[in-house]
Amino acid sequence: MVPQVLLFVLLLGFSLCFGKFPIYTIPDELGPWSPIDIHHLSCPNNLVVEDEGCTNLSEFSYMELKVGYISAIKVNGFTCTGVVTEAETYTNFVGYVTTTFKRKHFRPTPDACRAAYNWKMAGDPRYEESLHNPYPDYHWLRTVRTTKESLIIISPSVTDLDPYDKSLHSRVFPGRKCSGITVSSTYCSTNHDYTIWMPENPRPRTPCDIFTNSRGKRASNGNKTCGFVDERGLYKSLKGACRLKLCGVLGLRLMDGTWVAMQTSGETKWCPPDQLVNLHDFRSDEIEHLVVEELVKKREECLDALESIMTTKSVSFRRLSHLRKLVPGFGKAYTIFNKTLMEADAHYKSVRTWNEIIPSKGCLKVGGRCHPHVNGVFFNGLILGPDDHVLIPEMQSSLLQQHMELLESSVIPLMHPLADPSTVFKEGDEAEDFVEVHLPDVYKQISGVDLGLPNWGKYVLMTAGAMIGLVLIFSLMTWCRRANRPESKQRSFGGTGGNVSVTSQSGKVIPSWESYKSGGEIRL
């Protein structure tokens, strides 16, 4: 029995608030007490507010938020960062060209960013070519600077749309907020001076497809509408509702934090700026179905307790606790004073923490002050314990409240480099590290030879150099051939000291050169 009570309180709490769960209901307005007979006891109907007299139920259609609308209001965009790559060249006397690359930032224009984004999305090679380093120019004995502008597109960069004022929220914005995209303002500034944010969709249209039409039953009394039974079967009271626009659509914010758009006859005040609406997701719908089932089950338990009272003709504090109104709204409160059964009209409110109703020992806070007890008895089964502590049977559900809060899920969006809180920007207009991964490496290089001549002069010089080289090679080969010829003759006629015979002009064999000379002189 106790686990079912805890589950009910927990499920009921989830559907009635956003953030911390309400764990109890207690009157914030309590009328005068009057004695009654046990036959006047009744179980509250938590699905329809009978006390307002709106018992006429008629089908109608209304508009509410789509399931998961908070996660659906995402505006996809991109960031555009301007980068200037500078190539500085110096050509020395012998013609060596030294090139040094540097990068700086510049603030881009929205039109140029839109064009670069379209290039990137379409796979246009012009985008990749725009990221290349500039082709350096150089002149002999001069320093020449060549610059090239590039636009770094980083996508996606997802922002959250505030449906109340249509502003955009992201860590990439200064103060994490941008006033929004309009016809006159097509971009948002970022926390980097040389980067702007733009939406993927160039049309300045707010993506507010967050509403859906639902069917329910209107609870009315003549022309007065007190509330309605929603599509899940849970009654929603219009008491305390205020007017609130979401994405330009006028609707009502109910006391439980839900938002609906429906026709009402009465005048309703506007909501203050701090009044927000609750999340609407599949989990809340599922829990609301479970809440309806639990409300029906709790009504059956209340009827069982009431039957026991009628049968035994006796009333206990624990049995009276079953007659408490379980949802905010009008109801009855019961107690026993001096063995007399008492009843009072009450308007119940939700309690999110026990400190709201038990601020100090022995104090049960009702209507802004400590409610007096009669011999340790309050109402609805609430009593004062022997140690002067207020005893509430459902207080043990607070242990499960902490457990349920741990089960709340959160969505971690893509971390844009500008949204990283650890990012530290450099001083001046020096290029940041987050753009380097999108650009070619810059390095210092020595390449090329330049003698200060025009292009045709370079070709003439190269041709002349080639011809001179050929002449030098030919001359060298000729010199080497001439140098080798005398050496070979000396080896042929010098001999090694032995006799060498030659033939004279007369055909006579002469044993040596000297004999040949002698013979010649004799003949003469």
Swiss-Prot record:
Ranges in the topological domain labelled Intravirion: 481-524
SUPFAM superfamilies the record matches: Viral glycoprotein ectodomain-like
Modification after translation, per record: Glycosylated and palmitoylated by host. Glycosylation is crucial for glycoprotein export at the cell surface.
Subcellular localization(s) per the UniProt record: Virion membrane
Bilayer disposition of the protein: Single-pass type I membrane protein
Glycosylation sites: N56, N223, N338
Domain of life: Viruses
One Pfam family in the UniProt entry: Rhabdo_glycop_FD
Biotechnology comment: Primary surface antigen capable of inducing and reacting with virus-neutralizing antibodies. Almost all human and veterinary vaccines are based on the functional aspects of the G protein.
Transmembrane segments: 460-480
Note: Arg-352 is highly involved in rabies virus pathogenicity. Its mutation dramatically attenuates the virus.
Protein name: Glycoprotein
Source species of the chain: Rabies virus (strain China/MRV) (RABV)
Lineage of producing organism: Viruses, Riboviria, Orthornavirae, Negarnaviricota, Haploviricotina
